[in-house]
C-alpha cells in the first residue's frame, strides 16, 4: 500500500466510509477512536496526513491538533491535518484552523471532495 494517513474518528460508519474511499486510491489508513489514542498513534507512526474529527469522546479535535503541533516529534508540526466535522457553525472553521488544522471539511463527507482535499497534500498512490 501507499502513503500513511491517520484518521481519528469515533464513529465506526464514518471510519468505514473513509477507509474504503482512501484505500481504493492506494492509501494506507491507520485508525484511532479517541483523541488520546490519536495523539499516541501520530507520535508512534510515520504519517503523511491526519484526518481529524472534532467531536471525540475524550479530548476534542481542537486539543488534539494543538497537542500534535506541540509534539516532541518534530514532523508533527508540519504534517497536514484535515478537520472533518459535523460542526458547521460560523466560527468553527476558524477555530479548527487556529488550533493547527490546515483544512476544514464539514460532514456529511463528500467522497470526491475528500479525495481532492487529501490529494492536494499527498498524491494518490494508485493514480
Q: Which residues fall in each region the model found?
A:
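Short hydrophobic/Thr-rich beta-strand motif most characteristic of the beta2 strand and flanking loop
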Residues: 26-33, 41, 105
